[in-house]
Amino acid sequence: MTWGFLKQGIFRERSRVGKQKFYHCVSRYFHYLPPVLAILLPVGSWPFLSEQQWRYSYFLFPVVSSLGWLFAIGLRERQLRAAAGQLLETKIRKLTERDEGLKNIRETIEKRQKEANRLKLHNDKLVERLGQAREVVIQAKGRYDHMEEKSRKLHEENKQLQMQLEAAVRERNEKILENQELRQELKETLAYQQELHDEYQATFVEQHNMLDKRQAYIGNLEAKVQDLMCELRNLLQLEVGAKTELPGRPMASRDVVAQLVLEFRKIVFRVETTEAADSLTALRYTRTDPSAHNYSLACRQLFDDLREENLGMLFIYAPFAQRVLFANALFKDWTGHGLEDFLNKEGDVVLEGFAQWERDLLTESRTERSGKIVIKTKAFGATPFYYCVVTLDKGPLAEHVLGVLYPAKASFFTNLSYI
């Protein structure tokens, strides 16, 4: 490191000597520059001056030239003084060279001068190093202050984290206590539910035994109901056979509609009575029979009963689906058409009264609706028919329409006997 500083000092000394030589050369000839500029400036600007400016130039140019010459003379005096000092120093050196004592003193002075220069150079190096050390100290102090500030912030963050940790620990302890309380409540709830389950299980077994007893009782009643149903059907059939005329025998033309409505009500009552009787049977309480099977069985039994009726052209119609569910064989026998043809507005089966006929079929009223329509039969042409319809109120075909059609003329059966 010492050799590096020494090389750096030598380089700086050489640079200083070179600069002194350059400045000495420049200062030697610099005193010629101001007078030359003082002379050339007015001469060079003379062609560019106006006539009015020429008047002032006679006064301006001598002043400028005088100032330039005064400046040059001052520089020259300083150079002469410097040259006199150098000449005096040279003479002193020559005198000291002749005298041995003065020569020794001079050498001593030169050595001390060199030592002073060396010390000065060393001092400059020390000052420079001191400046560098001061910069390092300042930087270290800045870093120390930065670290101190950072340490303070970290300390504050540590306090905040410690407070958060304590809050989290307290919350955790509270959650643990709450969890223990919830577990205790859950155990008590489970115990209570187990007691309820045992109680419900005992109640279910008791109710199941009671249902088995009632099922056995209902099974005993079923046989009695079936016997009563058979007797009721026999009585109804006897009543119908006594009061209802066969299709081959014409009704009285004066009260055909009233008698048709009366007989139709009996059929409706018989259907509803059948449904009520079926609802009392054990099939309603049997857990093994599905409801769809019971529904289809009840409908099939109802259709079989309606096929045995000979009041007229009986049918069952679903208004919400606009679909025919049942129609007996008299439709084909008397008219040669199916019930679907009677409901077709675009067809030519219903010649008169179609609007009222359609309105009565789609009406949701529970009362009987009756009327008259003219039908184009395949065998006899246009033939009037009375009709009576009603919306069923209960049973498997509730909300469906039950209806009957009957010829309005007694001659229809006379003509039918010839076919």
From Swiss-Prot:
InterPro entries (alphabetical): UPF0242_N, UPF0242_PAS
Transmembrane segments: none
Record family assignment: Belongs to the UPF0242 family.
Name of the protein this chain belongs to: UPF0242 protein TC_0906
Species the sequence originates in: Chlamydia muridarum (strain MoPn / Nigg)
